[in-house]
Amino acid sequence: MRAPTVNAPKISDLPSGTGSYRFLYFSELIKRPICVGKIKDRIGKLTDLVFSLTEPYPQAVGIYIEHGWNKPTEFIPWARVLRIEDDAIFVQPPGNGNTYPPFVDQPDWILVDKHLMGRTILDMDGRRVEVVNDVHLLESKGRMLIVHVDISFNGFLRRWGLGGIRWIKDQLISWKYVQPLSVEE
């Protein structure tokens, strides 16, 4: 059975209890500045989003940030993310006043850029479907969920910074029908 593609998510497809919400694409968030307090208090940039493989939709557990060359990467728990704006992601300062902990991968965690972007996905029968060009996220009530993957050429263009060019409609596959080929890599 081939996974159905959808042109736009329907309200009935959303997880229950979402209330007010907004959709984002991962390609719009990657490399976005991470700030503590004000926009001028930049501490790094987003390099990946970390999700727990919960059913039916993976839920964000944190963000993976980088400070620059030869500086350690850090993991900011999702509970410390205050808000996501068009120009930056705002977080609370580290609890101990010094730094956030380094990132340590956990079982049943998935990193969007590392494990999904550009990867082949399978349909429910284990057949190859397409390559993931972008990941469609739902932000609601302090949570972020993976709800779709985008296999369209538009997703490919967004991924490479050409999101203003639109050739065709987005082709979204609900996460319910997605199985990454490999998360262990």
Could you tell me what each predicted segment is?
Residues M1-E185:
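Peripheral interaction segments used for macromolecular assembly
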